Design a protein with these regions (language model features):
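C-terminal catalytic "cap/lid" subdomain
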Residues: 1-194
Length: 194
C-alpha cells in the first residue's frame, strides 16, 4: 500500500531467500532463482505454496503496474527476482513448480445432478457461508460428479455443511452424501504457455 500511496517506481521485498524459486528448495535442492517473472505467474506460484509474496498485499501494486523486486537480506548483491507485467519471455515453458499439502478432496456425486442447474452454486454458497475456501474445482464431463479441493482442516466442516444443504436430495437417493478423502497435495506447474 505504501508503494502505491508514494507512487514508488519499484517495490522491494527483502527476505531470507534469494528471490522466487523454480520450486521449494527444501524439497528440490536444485531449485534456481527465477530472475524475471510476470505478476500472473508469481501470483499463481504463491497461491499454491510459494510464500515469498502474499497476493492480497501486493494486489494494489499489481493494479498500478509497479515492478516488485524480491531480494535476499543476506546476499544483497544477488539479482533476486523482478516481478513485472511484461517480463522477458522465458526459454522454458515451465517457469516454476509449486505445491500445497494437507489437501482434502470432496466429491459430490449422484444422478440427480445431471441436467439440473444450480448444484454447483448451492455447494459454493454453502461452503462460503461456512468460511471454507475452495482451492481447486473439477467436474466430470458427465456432470455426474463434482470434486473440489479444500484444506484438510476444513474437510469435516465442509462435509457437515454440504450434507445439510443437500439433505433432501440425499434422502431421495438423487445424491450421495459428500465423500471426503484426505492426505492429498496439489502440484502446480506455472509458465507462460502452461
Amino acid at each position: 500500500l505504501y508503494a502505491v500511496g508514494c507512487k514508488a517506481r519499484v517495490l522491494e521485498i527483502w527476505t531470507d531467500v534469494p528471490g522466487m524459486m523454480t520450486s521449494n528448495p527444501k524439497v528440490v535442492p536444485t531449485a534456481r532463482t527465477i530472475s524475471h517473472i510476470s505478476y500472473k505467474a508469481a501470483l499463481e506460484l504463491s497461491h499454491f505454496g510459494a510464500k515469498v509474496i502474499y497476493p492480497p498485499t501486493i494486489q494494489p501494486v499489481v493494479a498500478e503496474g509497479i515492478p516488485i523486486y524480491v531480494k535476499n537480506t543476506f546476499g544483497p548483491e544477488a539479482h533476486g527476482t523482478l516481478i513485472e507485467k511484461n517480463p522477458p519471455r522465458s526459454k522454458d515453458s515451465v517457469i516454476g513448480i509449486s505445491n500445497s499439502d494437507n489437501i482434502a478432496l470432496l466429491s459430490l456425486e449422484g444422478s440427480g445432478m445431471v441436467g439440473i442447474p444450480g448444484f454447483s452454486s448451492r455447494l459454493f454458497e454453502t461452503l462460503s457461508q461456512n468460511d471454507i475456501n475452495i482451492i481447486l474445482i473439477t467436474q466430470a464431463s458427465s456432470v455426474h460428479t463434482m470434486c473440489i479441493a479444500v484444506s484438510e482442516k476444513d474437510a469435516e466442516k465442509a462435509r457437515e455443511a454440504a450434507d445439510k444443504c443437500f439433505a433432501y436430495e440425499i434422502s431421495l437417493g438423487k445424491l450421495n452424501p459428500l465423500k471426503v478423502e484426505k492426505g492429498f497435495s496439489i502440484v502446480c506447474l506455472v509458465g507462460d504457455d502452461v
